[in-house]
């Protein structure tokens, strides 16, 4: 593992229980090497991380902090710029999992201050390829994972198996898609394009998210997980039905032509912390900027029929 050589027994790292297991489990294993693993826990009722609690965990011994930009279950958008500043003040690195946020916010990695930011291109309308943005000075400290004679080539140092050329070439389509989206809506200046695209995504998603949250909040037979206010979250909405199982809701939606998910979504620690049985799981509904108002109406009408 890349970070194994940069920490020693007695050093500390911070993880959260809000994460997809991919951004916490691998770091927790360092405890076997004498690394002290501190957990930043969520609030039981909301699933949110309280930034003030982080102050009690950070110290001069903290080497790095792993945190999600937003959870794939509660979808609360964490104040990453504030979190990375706190970590940097004690000399700690930050590893941010942006998978659940990237499709909805076009993150400005520099402004966020993350040392490493990860997301999946297939979540951002591209090929099935992972992306890891690493601050250049950090690549020197991480060492070479590739062939020894490629050590001086930054784009090869962290790719031990070599690049998947077809996927890398296809990644360009993501940028082209956002360019086309901006142009379609009257954008002309490339320099300000990222911010305009963020506003376009936000403007399309928020009204629909507001409708769904209001609907679920009004029901007494479900538990909505995460913020009930649209502006505080990404449009990934999870809930626990009280009368039937998440799997039953998922199957019934599928029969009505509506895609959903049911399960723990690899966030077992989070569900445990919130008092939700991971084996039963949650219903998860996700949508993006091209979801239509008509589709949201179809979803709400279907939930009415299924939940009773």
Question: Can you say where each PLM-predicted feature lies in the sequence?
Answer:
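Pyridoxal 5′-phosphate
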Residues: 1-308
